[in-house]
């Protein structure tokens, strides 16, 4: 059963990371469009918001993919999913926004699971732990 759990953890990390890597990469390549979207939500300091979004989404997505600092990054991405749902997807009269809100809540649950249980045996975290490498 251990092989099944390891495979599921790896496939889960891959699936969960794709949305964030894709979104973060898009934001990195289109800063003006991202900043305009943030301004449309009446957020202050959109230049910093753009940088934060790129770091959290692209950096966090890559970290989850690799299983690096998985528990901490999982918690950060769970909070990010709730924040972006509350900021950008609360127009429940629009069915599309309702679906995006629920998608964010589902991702929140997945990231909380990652935060609780880690990235599995096939992660950089586990590899470093096996080798006794300190990540401080």
What are these regions (language model features)?
Residues 29-44:
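Membrane-interface interhelical connector segments
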């Amino acid at each position: 059963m251990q092989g099944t759990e390891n495979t599921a953890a790896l496939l889960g990390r891959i699936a969960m990371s794709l949305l964030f890597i894709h979104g973060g990469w898009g934001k990195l390549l289109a800063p003006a469009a991202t900043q305009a979207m943030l301004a449309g939500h009446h957020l202050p300091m959109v230049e910093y918001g753009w940088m934060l979004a790129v770091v959290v989404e692209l950096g966090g997505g890559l970290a989850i993919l690799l299983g690096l600092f998985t528990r901490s990054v999982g918690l950060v991405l769970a909070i990010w999913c709730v924040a972006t749902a509350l900021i950008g997807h609360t127009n429940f009269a629009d069915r599309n926004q309702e679906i995006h809100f629920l998608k964010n809540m589902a991702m929140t649950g997945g990231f909380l699971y990652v935060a609780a249980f880690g990235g599995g045996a096939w992660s950089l975290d586990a590899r470093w732990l096996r080798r006794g490498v300190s990540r401080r």
